[in-house]
Design a protein with these regions (language model features):
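Glycine-rich nucleophile elbow surrounding the catalytic serine of serine-hydrolase chemistry
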Residues: 141-151
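Short, surface-exposed "cap/lid" segments of acyl-processing enzymes
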Residues: 55-103
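Conserved small/polar residues in nucleotide/adenosyl-binding loops
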Residues: 158-160
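Active-site signature of alpha/beta-hydrolase-fold catalytic machinery across serine-
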Residues: 82, 151-155
Length: 160
């Protein structure tokens, strides 16, 4: 693989990739997001915590964005709040589906989530679709959540 030479120079006040990653997350204003929490019972006897945002004017056909967070992320992660605020601005519903034992409450079963596990991802998407069959369903994942979503979509014959 060839080495790509770049003439990019980091600003003197913000050298290095670590600082360039951390500063925006800490210094940028965060949108105010109000969630409605739902504890959803799962077929295996466990539960998931879902944090919903909804526009003031509710349209049953409005798109729904399902967000799968990163490792130990939650609906309070800066990226989740920004994404859910954007949903509300567009008139969409949005839901952050917390993986097991994320979202501030330990689960009942001794089952954890991991990057290669797409079963819960599949269950979430199918459950949301059953509840809102006329809504356009969309999904996004960040980091670990993106891996689970990509695995599910790659193995699935379902068009999402």
């Amino acid at each position: 693989m060839p080495i790509v030479v770049s003439d990019y120079k980091a600003p003197s006040w913000c050298p290095g990739g670590h600082l360039q990653t951390v500063l925006p997350a800490k210094l940028m204003p965060r949108p105010k997001v109000s969630y409605r929490r739902e504890k959803v019972e799962m077929p295996d006897g466990d539960f998931m915590l879902w944090d919903w945002v909804e526009p003031e004017v509710k349209d049953v056909t409005a798109p729904i964005l399902v967000h799968f967070h990163g490792l130990e992320g939650s609906s309070r992660s800066h990226y989740a709040e920004a994404l859910m605020a954007s949903c509300v601005e567009r008139g969409w519903r949005g839901v952050v589906a917390h993986f097991r034992s994320c979202g501030g409450e330990m689960n009942r079963l001794p089952r954890a989530y991991f990057a290669g596990d797409s079963a819960d991802c599949e269950w979430v998407l199918k459950t949301v679709h059953r509840r809102y069959p006329t809504a356009d369903l969309r999904a996004v994942g960040v980091s670990l959540g993106a891996n689970q979503l990509a695995k599910f979509l790659g193995l699935s014959l379902i068009h999402i």
